[in-house]
Amino acid sequence: MSMTPREIVHELNRHIIGQDDAKRAVAIALRNRWRRMQLPEELRVEVTPKNILMIGPTGVGKTEIARRLAKLANAPFIKVEATKFTEVGYVGRDVESIIRDLADAAIKMLREQEMTRVRHRAEDAAEDRILDALLPPARMGFSNEEAPTQDSNTRQLFRKRLREGQLDDKEIEIEVAEMAGIEIATPPGMEEMTNQLQNLFANMGKGKKKARKLKVKEALKLVRDEEAGRLVNEEELKAKALEAVEQHGIVFIDEIDKVAKRGNVGGADVSREGVQRDLLPLIEGCTVNTKLGMVKTDHILFIASGAFHLSKPSDLVPELQGRLPIRVELKALSPQDFERILSEPHASLTEQYCALLKTEGLNIQFQPEGIKRLAEIAWQVNEKTENIGARRLHTLLERLLEEVSFSAGDLASAHDDKAIQIDAEYVNSHLGELAQNEDLSRYIL
């Protein structure tokens, strides 16, 4: 990650409106990963990541920051929900599976990078195998010395046609590696055993080939992936993945507030507190057994987030609070924020709806006053009913464009090239009455 904090924030600004404090915190945390790697070995070991706790109401951008961060990080990244885990001894997934999933993510990410690196060599090898199936090499005889030259010319001609896609629909018989994948259904919490069994069956079927009849296009893809897999050094890949997880891994734990203890202690709270206590060694630093080997979690960055509308950050066990030293509060959204969300981000909601309806030949245009009125209604409905943040915009837009989406084909032919204008009047006529009636808006919007 060689991007500076300012560049990271700038990239996040393309997709997320406001929440500058949260963006700055994750940008600094991400940059510190790079800074740490520049230090001498003896000092690098001592520098541990400063984990982050993001606090804010639902629908203000906590999860979206995680999603965008995953794309920027170019590091093993996993997002999990705290509610999916149970303490050791209860039926369900234990928290150590977070690190096992992170190891899987690292292997997948690095394998894709390696596959891309060897792609050209794999494509050449795959082409040769397809051409061998199309044109079996001629046997050498004493009578005809010109055969190799003619054969080479024919092969080059077929190679050209193959690259141009002229042979895509031709059917050939070719030997490809047998798919050794096998699905094993096991109860929650037994993922490690499942992985071991799958690896065992995969190794048993390794190297076996099977003749299959396929179209050239499908065969080329299969053979290319097979050749690329052969060029990738699995042992080297595992070693790199292990280092990537330990030194650059990022875990985003969502809904952390749902495992916080609430005022009245009930039976379920025992399990909640147990999950927190199981998370402690993971965040502090421990060793977890994965398919890559033993993974140390000392330098993995943990970012936790929660709405905390039924509980407070102080309801988390004190040790866990201490392991999340950086606190960031995300603010509730204002009507102006809603307006900006609808118009400013890259691939905004309004842009998405315009593009979707354009596929039917129907043009719609969102006018500034229409967007403003839509933002006001979203804010009003949130204030009157449950505040679900920017997610309210999805509900409103679906309701607003329901008739247009249903009759898009008919409207396209009726309007020719004229665009349907979504202005304040249009918004009021479709949503105004619903927004004013609290009972209706509670159930419909």
Swiss-Prot record:
Alphabetical keyword list: ATP-binding, Chaperone, Cytoplasm, Nucleotide-binding, Stress response
Pfam name, any one: AAA_2
Residues engaged in binding ATP: I17, G59, V60, G61, K62, T63, E64, D254, E319, R391
SS bonds (residue pairs): none
InterPro entries from the UniProt entry: AAA+_ATPase, ATP-dep_Clp_protease_ClpX, ATPase_AAA_core, Clp_ATPase_C, HslU, P-loop_NTPase
An annotated Gene Ontology molecular function: ATP hydrolysis activity
Top-level lineage group: Bacteria
Tagged with keyword Membrane: no
SMART domains, per database record: AAA, ClpB_D2-small
GO biological process, one term: protein unfolding
UniProt cross-references to SUPFAM superfamilies, sorted A to Z: P-loop containing nucleoside triphosphate hydrolases
Protein location: Cytoplasm
Record GO cellular component, one term: HslUV protease complex
Function: ATPase subunit of a proteasome-like degradation complex; this subunit has chaperone activity. The binding of ATP and its subsequent hydrolysis by HslU are essential for unfolding of protein substrates subsequently hydrolyzed by HslV. HslU recognizes the N-terminal part of its protein substrates and unfolds these before they are guided to HslV for hydrolysis.
Quaternary structure and interacting proteins, as annotated: A double ring-shaped homohexamer of HslV is capped on each side by a ring-shaped HslU homohexamer. The assembly of the HslU/HslV complex is dependent on binding of ATP.
PANTHER family to which the protein is assigned, alphabetical: ATP-DEPENDENT CLP PROTEASE ATP-BINDING SUBUNIT CLPX-LIKE, MITOCHONDRIAL-RELATED, ATP-DEPENDENT PROTEASE ATPASE SUBUNIT HSLU
HAMAP family membership: HslU
The family this protein is said to belong to: Belongs to the ClpX chaperone family. HslU subfamily.
Protein name: ATP-dependent protease ATPase subunit HslU
Phylogenetic lineage: Bacteria, Pseudomonadati, Pseudomonadota, Gammaproteobacteria, Pseudomonadales
